[in-house]
């Protein structure tokens, strides 16, 4: 006799959700929709670094600001409310990051089309012959 298979992929399973508490709701909902039990146990808290602790960063000398995540966008903007100089190009590592920039009224100048993440960024032609440019990576 063959065992019956549940229509819900996660039925009877417990899933540990380690995302920050304010970011876990969507994942918890998806787990529960598939019959799983979500155990919320945030292991990190994401906080902004005070702009005074950034050291010698000078926006006027920056050519590229590279954001690697939605959290990077949110925390950077909390700590740096001033507008960016017009010459600074904003780079998003993926679609979620780009969306976070747009939600804050910013224009994404560069984003990998096919591959999300730093690997996709490094494959872009703009990064192949870069010289005399200051790149700030926000993570």
List where the protein language model places each region:
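Signature of uroporphyrinogen-III synthase
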Residues: 2-139
């Amino acid at each position: 006799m063959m065992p019956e298979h549940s229509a819900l992929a996660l039925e009877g399973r417990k899933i540990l959700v380690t995302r920050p508490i304010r970011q876990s709701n969507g994942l918890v909902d998806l787990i529960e929709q598939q019959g799983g039990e979500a155990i919320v146990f945030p292991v990190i808290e994401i906080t902004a670094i005070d702009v005074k602790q950034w050291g010698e960063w000078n926006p006027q000398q920056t050519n590229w600001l590279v954001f690697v995540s939605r959290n990077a966008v949110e925390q950077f903007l909390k700590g740096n409310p001033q507008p960016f100089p017009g010459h600074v190009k904003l780079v998003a590592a993926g679609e979620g990051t780009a969306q976070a920039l747009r939600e804050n009224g910013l224009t994404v100048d560069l984003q990998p089309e096919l591959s999300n993440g730093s690997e996709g960024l490094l494959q872009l032609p703009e990064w192949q012959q870069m010289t005399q440019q200051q790149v700030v990576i926000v993570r």
